[in-house]
């Protein structure tokens, strides 16, 4: 493993994972103790042998014994020195480890950096997070460099320490002078063979006895390893259940060669020991014998320290409640870990018994954050799981929901593959039973992607019966009166010089539109009905005065550029058919307009209109498309019935009170020269031949004419009768040509007309026109003309006061008029019309001053209109022709800025206004039938509008004084009763239609939306989930969620990472209804029931520390 290329997630995790420096410290202590024991043994051995030689044992044998023992005593002394040196090197290694642990980046910081990166990338829809993402990545690179530097220093220090260790010399295998046949052990081998015991081949057998075992030679269920006897062991040669390690006898031990339950370490005998070589219960350290000892090489109960014998306190740790606890903060018995609630826990913050892992709720768990029993993995909800993140039992794999799954992320039972939903699936990502292939739906599939499901939704063939909607009677009702309270608008001033920068409206493309053919049902009958009467109440508008001197600052409207518009060619569908129909008769009731009087003395204060500058306008050349073709068509026959217009009389004595218009000063107006564009081309056409000789009209001058006051006498016109006139058919007008006609300039001088009066003009007889019939006719013609109109300058003029008398019209009748069908012989071709570009120069209109003036009172008497009847109008069936237009392109048009000078709005005062009530009687409509209309499919081509550019401009400052509106009351409005007409809709046939189809392809699970594959149902998030409704990564169970960047969890409705149990919130939480308060990237380590905080176990604990 090359740490220099590993990311900081792995390097930091490797340093902070595991047991930390404690095993090395224990090893250093053990080596130190071994050195002392070896030195003591060497001194004791030398003393004993020398005592024997110099004392009780004399002779040759004594000398031979001393010679044989001397090498062994020397080896013991050398081994003691080497053991002491090894202890020193172990202490140096601890220092190196502590240094690198301090130097590397904390894993939670790396996880937070990656979580922030994921959050920024997911929300980076428009690239707005690019700087923040770059900063996050730069910090991540610094973390990478820091970890590589720390690991390099650690590697160098560890290598130096390891190279300083010298290998131990091999101890003596045989005593000096021992016969070879005895030293070789041949008698033992001979005895074994003689007994007939066969020698076992090296290595375990590959056959398992049980369910869901991974490995070989296992007896039991859910073991992962070799030659385990029991259930859920992770390792080799274990006897028992839930062990994590090798050669353990018992259950829930985390380590090697332990005998007992819940030991964390190696070579322990007993229950709940934390360390190595302990014998007893709940010892913490090395080589202890007894109960609840903390330290090394103690013999007794509750001792704290090293190499002690005796009985100490009931608890050797601190803050415990119970007996024989060697850890701290425990509640219970024989706990060697810290913060536990229960019995025999060697891990930390467990709720239950004999847990060697951390943060578990349950019993005999060697893993961490489990809710259940005998779990070796982490964050499991269930029992006897050697994998992690499982909800169920006996799962050697991870993230499974179910039982006996040796694969990963399965939902079901006995699945050997991964991401399966079902039972006994050996392949991967299957839904069903006994599938050996991959991504199948069903049973016993061996291929890939077999058994997909297809569904389609099809409507049946339906015929809707005719629908008759009867008339509905709506009784008369009145809307309630509405009162609008007085409203006060405070004075306000907009900020000056608000600048709006130039901007462009984006281009717009309208896609092609397809309108399918449609036919309305024939003969929809609408029964006769009447619109209800309506009464509008009198309206009182109180007096109001606008605030004086509202000031609007000078401002300029920005320039506007309209882009060229491309209107594609279009063709209307041919043969749109409209069936014959008749419009119903319509009766308009008599309308009474009551008398009304405008209030007198409406005063408008003096004001000035600001100067206005109109910029020069450039209208580019434009050309209409040539050859617009209108297909032949026939207009239907149209019958207009006779129309009776009753007599009408305008009210007499309409009085306009005297008033004075204010003085009006019109400033000089400068209209610059204008030139029409040259080369206006009208496509040629011909009038029939017509010969008129040239006519020359000389200049005509009319001198000033003055007409004084005069009176016209009464004028009597006798009865005039125009006889019937018949124009015969077949009249033909031959072709003719109009020559050019030239007129000289004509000047009309000033004409004045004095005051005069017109007498009453009228007639008291009826005017009657005979029936007029216009037969069908055709007009073939071609029109050509050319004209030139010189400049025309009208002089100023004035009109003095005049009065007109009453105008009286007698009754008259319009007879029925029949227009027969006529035909326009096609095709009719309109040639192209070219209009060249021309310029309109700028026009400067200076300010106009208007003095204050008063509007007079105007009175109108009541007006009554008689009843007016329109009989039905009949229209025959007709067909609209096809119309084709060529593509039209409009050129770009630019409108320059328009400047407006500052100005002040005058004060306006209006007195109260009262309108009289108005009543509209009901309007009657006879029944009628809607025709059938058929339209073929219509397809419109795409239309693109290019961007429109606006230059920057500045908004003027506007100041308004306070405005207060008086209360306004609207009286009730009455609506008379009416009946909706009956409506008949004929039957409609709906053919069978397929609305849509969907398929469930072969793949893992059902209705999952996770990024990576998941099994189960309704799972989302990063993927690798199983179960139901989980959102995240590596989850199992029901409705669990882990935030982005976190992995694993099981149970029901948990939110966080590395959690198990039910309804927990936080990471590193197990049990029921617990809440961890640390960030989700950090394990809160909470177990038990309803706890809130961090590092808690038990029931209903609460802390924020």
From Swiss-Prot:
- One biological-process term from Gene Ontology? response to host immune response
Taxonomically, which superkingdom?
Bacteria
Record-linked InterPro entries: Mycobac_pentapep (IPR002989), PPE_dom (IPR000030), PPE_sf (IPR038332)
Q: Give a Pfam family name.
A: Pentapeptide_2
| Disulfide-bonded cysteines | none
Q: Which family does it belong to?
A: Belongs to the mycobacterial PPE family.
- The protein's name is Uncharacterized PPE family protein PPE24
- The gene is PPE24
């Amino acid at each position: 493993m090359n740490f220099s290329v590993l990311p900081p997630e792995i390097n930091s995790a490797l340093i902070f994972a595991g047991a930390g420096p404690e095993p090395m410290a224990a090893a250093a202590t053990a080596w130190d103790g071994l050195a002392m024991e070896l030195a003591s043994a060497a001194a004791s051995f030398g003393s004993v042998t020398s005592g024997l030689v110099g004392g009780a044992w004399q002779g040759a044998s004594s000398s031979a014994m001393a010679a044989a023992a001397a090498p062994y005593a020397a080896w013991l002394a050398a081994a003691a020195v080497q053991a002491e040196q090894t202890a020193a090197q172990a202490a140096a290694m601890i220092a190196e480890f502590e240094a690198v642990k301090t130097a590397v980046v904390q894993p939670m910081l790396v996880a937070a950096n990656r979580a922030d990166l994921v959050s920024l990338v997911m929300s980076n829809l428009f690239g707005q997070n690019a700087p923040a993402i770059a900063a996050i990545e730069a910090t991540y690179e610094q973390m990478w460099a820091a970890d590589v530097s720390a690991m390099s220093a650690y590697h160098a220090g560890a290598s130096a320490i390891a190279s300083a260790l010298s290998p131990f010399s091999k101890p003596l295998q045989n005593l000096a002078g021992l016969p070879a046949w005895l030293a070789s052990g041949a008698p033992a081998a001979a005895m074994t063979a003689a007994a007939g015991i066969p020698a076992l081949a090296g290595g375990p057998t590959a056959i398992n006895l049980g369910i869901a075992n991974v490995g070989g030679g296992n007896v039991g269920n859910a073991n992962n390893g070799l030659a385990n006897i029991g259930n859920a062991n992770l390792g080799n040669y274990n006897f028992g259940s839930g062990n994590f390690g090798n050669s353990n006898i018992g259950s829930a031990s985390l380590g090697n060669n332990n005998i007992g339950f819940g030991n964390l370490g190696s070579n322990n005998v007993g229950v709940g020991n934390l360390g190595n070589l302990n014998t007893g219960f709940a010892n913490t350290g090395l080589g202890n014998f007894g109960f609840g000892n903390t330290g090394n090489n103690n013999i007794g109960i509750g001792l704290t320290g090293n190499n002690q014998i005796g009985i100490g306190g009931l608890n050797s740790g601190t803050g415990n409640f119970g007996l024989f606890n060697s850890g701290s903060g425990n509640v219970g018995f024989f706990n060697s870990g810290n913060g536990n609630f229960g019995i025999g826990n060697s891990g930390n913050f467990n709720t239950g018994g004999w847990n060697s892992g951390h943060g578990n709720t349950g019993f005999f768990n060697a893993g961490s954050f489990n809710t259940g029993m005998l779990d070796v993995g982490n964050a499991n909800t269930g029992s006897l799981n050697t994998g992690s993140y499982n909800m169920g039992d006996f799962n050697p794999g991870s993230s499974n929901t179910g039982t006996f799954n040796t694969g990963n992320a399965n939902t079901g039972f006995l699945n050997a593959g991964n991401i399966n939903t079902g039972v006994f699936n050996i392949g991967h990502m299957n839904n069903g039973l006994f599938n050996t292939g991959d991504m199948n739906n069903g049973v016993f599939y061996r291929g890939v992607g077999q058994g997909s499901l297809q569904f389609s939704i099809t409507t049946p063939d339906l015929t809707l019966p005719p629908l008759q909607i009867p008339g509905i009677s709506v009784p008369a009702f009145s809307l309630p009166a509405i009162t609008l309270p007085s409203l006060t608008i405070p004075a306000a001033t907009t900020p000056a010089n608000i600048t709006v920068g130039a901007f462009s409206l984006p281009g717009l493309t309208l896609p092609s539109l397809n309108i399918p053919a449609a036919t309305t049902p024939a003969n929809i009958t609408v029964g006769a009905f009447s619109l209800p009467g309506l009464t509008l109440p009198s309206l009182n508008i109180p007096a109001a005065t606008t605030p004086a001197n509202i000031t609007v600052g000078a401002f300029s409207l920005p320039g506007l550029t309209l882009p060229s518009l491309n209107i594609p060619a279009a063709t209307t569908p041919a043969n749109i058919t409209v069936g014959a129909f008749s419009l119903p008769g319509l009766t308009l009731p008599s309308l009474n307009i009551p008398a009304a009087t405008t209030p007198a003395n409406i005063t408008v204060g003096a004001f000035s209109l600001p100067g206005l500058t109109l910029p020069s306008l450039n209208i580019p050349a434009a050309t209409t498309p040539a050859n617009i073709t209108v297909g032949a068509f026939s207009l239907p026959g149209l019958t207009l019935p006779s129309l009776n217009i009753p007599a009408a009389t305008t009210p007499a004595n309409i009085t306009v009170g005297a008033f004075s218009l204010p003085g009006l000063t019109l400033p000089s107006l400068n209209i610059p020269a204008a030139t029409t564009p040259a080369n206006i081309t009208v496509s040629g056409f011909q009038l029939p031949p017509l010969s008129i000789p040239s006519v020359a009209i000389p200049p005509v001058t009319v001198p000033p004419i003055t007409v004084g006051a005069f009176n016209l006498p009464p004028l009597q016109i006798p009865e005039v009768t125009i006889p019937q006139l018949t124009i015969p058919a077949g009249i033909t007008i031959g072709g003719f040509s109009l020559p050019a006609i030239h007129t000289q300039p004509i000047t009309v001088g000033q004409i004045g007309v004095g005051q005069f009066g017109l007498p009453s003009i009228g007639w008291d007889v009826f005017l009657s026109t005979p029936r007029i019939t216009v037969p069908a006719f055709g007009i073939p013609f071609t029109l050509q003309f050319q004209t030139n109109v010189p400049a025309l300058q009208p002089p100023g003029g004035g009109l003095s006061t005049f009065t007109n008398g009453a105008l009286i019209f007698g009754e008259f009748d319009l007879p029925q008029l029949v227009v027969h069908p006529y035909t326009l012989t096609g095709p009719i071709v309109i040639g192209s019309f070219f209009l060249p570009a021309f310029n309109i120069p700028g026009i400067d209109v200076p300010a106009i001053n208007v003095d204050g003036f008063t509007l007079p009172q105007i009175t109108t008497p009541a007006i009554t209109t008689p009843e007016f009847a329109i009989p039905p109008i009949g229209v025959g069936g007709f067909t609209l022709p096809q119309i084709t237009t060529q593509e039209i392109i409009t050129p770009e048009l630019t409108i320059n800025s328009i400047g407006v000078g500052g100005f002040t709005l005058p004060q306006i005062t209006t007195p109260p206004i009262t309108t009289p009530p108005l009543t509209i009687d009901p309007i009657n409509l006879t029944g009628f039938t809607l025709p059938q209309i058929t339209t073929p499919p219509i397809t419109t081509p795409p239309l693109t509008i290019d961007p429109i550019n606006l230059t920057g401009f500045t908004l003027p400052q506007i100041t308004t004084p306070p405005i207060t509106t008086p209360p306004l009351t609207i009286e009730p409005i009455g609506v008379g009763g009416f009946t909706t007409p009956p409506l008949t809709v004929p039957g409609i046939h709906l053919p069978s239609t397929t609305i849509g189809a969907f398929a469930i392809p072969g793949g893992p699970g059902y209705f999952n939306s996770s990024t990576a594959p998941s099994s189960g149902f309704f799972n989302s998030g990063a993927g690798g989930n199983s179960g139901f409704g989980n959102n995240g990564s590596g989850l199992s169970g029901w409705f669990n969620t882990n935030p982005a960047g976190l992995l694993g969890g099981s149970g029901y409705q948990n939110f966080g990472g590395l959690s198990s149990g039910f309804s927990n919130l936080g990471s590193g939480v197990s049990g029921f209804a617990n809440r961890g308060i640390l960030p989700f990237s950090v394990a809160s380590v909470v177990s038990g029931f309803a706890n809130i905080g961090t590092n808690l176990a038990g029931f209903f604990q609460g802390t924020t520390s």
